[in-house]
């Protein structure tokens, strides 16, 4: 011990020197090797056991991956050596998870701020709606402002109705005078007149449908009260052929069918502007119309105990005015001929 303290390089006995060297200098050399070259044994450790992956705190974060089996040493500013482990063929290809961890460097992992910025960029900027401006939309709907309703007394209503019957659209001066008289504002007077006009119009529309059924009922009553004892429908066709079917009283000729092939040419009983006299219809006589040559007319006279209540139907002839202006026998002569024919057939 004394020799080592004085000069460790003095020649000594080899046996003592070896003992001293084993006891004192060996731990120093081992510790020096462990501190100075901790990474030189890493390739050998990786070759022996590939599952063990040492992580050095001095490993560079900005490294370019290269296909190299040898480690690269670099001297930092502090003078300490640092090793850069590059992914290569040293690792077992059966470990994809470890390989992916080594392939991605720390600067390639996205940070939280970049993820947040990308998320906001995908959504776009939040812009307020131009319809609302700077106001914020609230989920709670605001309550509607209820209008104040003016309540009028009976005296005020009477005054207003009296003026309404005189003038439904009062002028501004009249509204001001009514406002002073009633004790309200001119705007309230205008609102009252507007509402009262709408009310009166609604009531008038409701009364119109109620009046229509009454008029229909009165017309039906009038039509039922009018009664003709013996009525005869008369129908004139467009081509000049006509047919009458009449109902006569009990003293009439029973069930007669009469037809005539030939007839005097061009005459009519009732033209387009003249109706047959009503007295003939009331007396039970049937009028006869004129026909052209070569056309036949069938007159059917039917009798019955009951009196038919049918209105008289007249259809004007569509022949030209020259037929209406032709000269022919009068109506009385025609009736006389018909009665004579009936008497001959009855005998």
Swiss-Prot record:
Residues 145-204 bind DNA. Keywords: Developmental protein, DNA-binding, Homeobox, Nucleus, Transcription, Transcription regulation. Transmembrane segments: none annotated. Residues 72-85 have a biased composition (Polar residues). GO terms for molecular function: DNA binding; DNA-binding transcription factor activity, RNA polymerase II-specific. Residues 1-20, 54-86 are annotated as: Disordered. Specifically expressed in early embryos. Disruption phenotype: No visible phenotype; mice are viable and fertile. It holds the Pfam family Homeodomain. One of its GO terms (cellular component) is nucleus. It comes from the Eukaryota. SUPFAM superfamilies: Homeodomain-like (SSF46689). InterPro entries: Distal-less_Homeobox_TF (IPR050460), HD (IPR001356), Homeobox_CS (IPR017970), Homeodomain-like_sf (IPR009057). It is found in: Nucleus. Belongs to the paired homeobox family. Obox subfamily. Transcription factor required for zygotic genome activation (ZGA), a critical event in early embryonic development during which the developmental control passes from maternally provided mRNAs to the expression of the zygotic genome after fertilization. This is Oocyte-specific homeobox protein 6. The gene is Obox6.
